[in-house]
Amino acid sequence: MPQTDAVDHVHRLLSCRLPARLRQCVVAVILCGLGPLAVQAQSGAGVSNPLSAVRASGGQLPSLGDNSALAAAAERRLGDRIAREIYRDPDYLDDAVLLEYVDRVWQPLLAASKARSEMSPEIEQRFAWEIMLGRDRTINAFALPGGYFGLHLGLIGVVSNRDELASVLAHEMSHVTQRHISRLISKQSEQTPWLIGAMILGVLAAGKNPEAANAVLAGGQAVAIQSQLNFSRDMEREADRVGFGVMTQGGFAPQGFVSMFDKLQQASRLNDNGSFPYLRSHPLTSERIADVQARQPPGPVVTLETTLEHAMVSARARVLSNSGADALRQYVAEASDPALASATPARQASVLYGAVLASEKTRDFAAARTLLARLDGLTRSTPQAQRLTNLLGAELALASGQPTPVLAAPGRPELLLSAQILTGQGRAAEASQALLSWVATHPRDASAWQLLAAASSAQGQLLRAIRADAEARVAQMDYAGALDRFKAGQTMVRNAGNAGVDHIEASIIDTRARAVQLLFREQSLER
């Protein structure tokens, strides 16, 4: 097999279609990172030279077939390293509306998995259980080490209801709770030190020169592990079985699993053109399809309807993942189709929502307001859909510079939008107060910290703005960047002397700088 094919096969380990630079780094981290991580986990000490650590361990990674299985703590550290790369990627998206909708599907699945004892207490506590959105229109979702999960907007855009989305998320969650990724990684215990060394060099090269990284990875003879990295058929069937149980116990309709399989099967029959990478990493087999169909409860087949809310969320995902000029014009044109009047309410809501958002993106605010009025009339009697209409209206008003009332609902989307509105209206103190209350209980919300930095700066509170900027970086595990900002705050305090210094804020910065310094040292030792 050509070396390039082998590298592509390695990429499919994580069922992930990432940008080339990030994909090379992630692959290298997966294939070599566990050498030093495993040594570190066993010794309790950091490892300053990963290549030396691999040589000291005989070049072997742990095997889950025996007692040297990859520890949950080591897997979480590996997941953190990958997540840090994803946070920095331009395709990473923190969209409050989409994330909230996905989280309302995700949380019942987590609760059901715990209730069924599918996850051990150790991984329940140690793993992140975090979903990260990718601005990619391909249909894909993937599990990463340490309880991180990726979800492409393309998948949100094609599922017809929350039950289909739940089936995919439950399947991916089950790959993690059943330790499939850990088992796959740990199979590589027989690789030679020179191969693992080449992969380590690939990590270093990926940060500076993607082409060099690709050459190093190919030169490392990745073909040696080609046949060992796919999820096995048994793993796929196990993820189906466990995921089905988690999904149904979580309150979702079992028909969602079947209808999602039908979508994937149709795509497979149509000779997938690359927009369904999920099919390549999770190939459908007749056994998988028959097994899921056999799990359906007896009785008539239930047809799952698309709610207005889901239709609007899917439309948002489609527009945000495909915002080229031609695509935006097409979204707007669909709203002018006379046949739309006879379509289902869900179809109308989807088209109108997408058209409003597309018009906003093209800065045709007059057209956007006209379309928004049509959407408002359609959704007024459905509270959840009306809420999405109100949020979209606030986004439009903010983008067009129109005065808009502050949103009062208590959700994260309202909070983040209201903070921007208040700051823009010269009411930054109110925005700061709301954001401070939020980050006190949600310290890993990088977007909230960034808005707090903007609100603090608008009030002339530069020291608080610097700290908020630093905390945003901490939330995404960019400890080097955070430490740089904390040090900038300390320098500001020293230069100001006692004149106008917020001593409480200065004390907080000193404390946080020391804590982040330790995190930065630990992070450096893992490289």
Label the model's feature ranges.
Residues 149, 158, 176, 299, ...:
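TPR/TPR-like alpha-solenoid repeats
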